[in-house]
């Protein structure tokens, strides 16, 4: 674990409870869904309960501290809150049963509304070159519609609402039209011929593009199955296989830069949670691809990714707890001095 050089350094990377911490809600909520899907109900219940607590702390924390404000430059944080609410809502009927489909719809509605606002404001800032230095966090507002698309397809399956299927397809296209180009630009900025390399504090965000890869694979399988035609199903499978190919180099980059940064003592920040949700989306995509193709080893790969995600959740939780406790102790010492 990284050792902080001072309490002040931790204060700089530990914002108050609020949307900046919503990566934890995203990761824990999705983990609970995946554990239930793969037959670990007791552990799934534990993580779902934890996700509920995290959601309450994040929302309550924002109501108290109002940090961050709802401004364009901090839309990535609000995009995380959007995806966290959608992930929590999606997990509820999966983990606790069909009685909570209504709760899922409410979470999806709120999360999607916030996400579309974040998407609109941030894509405008990027196009106008007002989003600052390129970073993988640029992609957070752009991936939000894809997360909403997956849940919309599931809502369509349950409630049998044709309009929801077209909403799902539209949200899918919204991310596909923007995120790949933006991520390509960021990769070129960090790893191109004239690049300086990715800063230590930004290394956890290298997982974010994998979130689009995994989430779009899952969405493509659900949308293809919902349309029902052989062509739609085949297109979804082909899309998933192509995304699977992209997973190899992008995953290798994320593993290398993130683990190297941790071993070099990168200071903890909420960005470490970026190593959780994207891995979970890959697991979800592999699981649905297994269902679409009947290829069982896709499901085994999904299980491996759950193990990796669980490892990242544990590391992020322990490192975060240590960081918060050191900050509290530091403040107490300064007050007693």
What are these regions (language model features)?
Residues 1-9, 52-68, 114-129, 162, ...:
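Hydrophobic, membrane-facing alpha-helical anchors
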Residues 4-34, 67-91, 108, 127-153, ...:
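Juxtamembrane helix-loop boundaries in multi-pass membrane proteins
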């Amino acid at each position: 674990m990284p050792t902080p050089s001072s309490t002040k350094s931790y204060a700089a990377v530990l914002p108050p409870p609020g949307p900046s911490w919503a990566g934890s809600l995203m990761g824990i909520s999705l983990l609970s869904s995946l554990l239930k899907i793969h037959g670990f109900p007791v552990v799934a219940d534990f993580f779902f309960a934890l996700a509920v607590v995290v959601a309450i702390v994040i929302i309550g924390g924002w109501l108290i501290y109002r940090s961050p404000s709802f401004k364009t430059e901090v839309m990535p944080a609000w995009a995380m809150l959007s995806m966290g609410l959608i992930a929590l809502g999606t997990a509820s009927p999966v983990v606790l049963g069909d009685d909570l489909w209504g709760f899922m719809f409410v979470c999806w509605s709120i999360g999607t509304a916030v996400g579309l606002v974040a998407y609109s404001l941030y894509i405008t800032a990027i196009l106008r070159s007002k989003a600052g230095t390129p970073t993988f966090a640029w992609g957070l507002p752009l991936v939000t519609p894809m997360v909403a698309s997956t849940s919309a397809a599931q809502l369509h399956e349950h409630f049998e609402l044709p309009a929801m299927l077209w909403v799902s397809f539209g949200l899918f296209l919204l991310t596909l039209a923007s995120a790949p180009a933006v991520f390509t630009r960021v990769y070129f900025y960090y790893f191109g011929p004239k690049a300086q390399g990715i800063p230590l504090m930004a290394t956890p965000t290298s997982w974010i593009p994998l979130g689009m890869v995994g989430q779009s694979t899952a969405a493509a399988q659900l949308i293809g199955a919902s349309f029902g035609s052989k062509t739609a199903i085949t297109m979804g499978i082909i899309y998933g296989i192509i995304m699977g190919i992209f997973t190899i180099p992008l995953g290798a980059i994320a593993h290398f830069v993130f683990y190297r940064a941790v071993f070099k003592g990168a200071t903890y920040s909420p960005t470490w949670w970026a190593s959780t949700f994207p891995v979970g989306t890959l697991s979800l995509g592999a699981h649905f691809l297994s269902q679409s193709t009947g290829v069982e080893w896709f499901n085994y790969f999904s299980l491996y990714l759950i193990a990796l995600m669980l490892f990242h959740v544990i590391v992020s939780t322990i490192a975060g707890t240590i960081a918060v406790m050191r900050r509290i102790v530091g403040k107490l010492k300064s007050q007693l001095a």
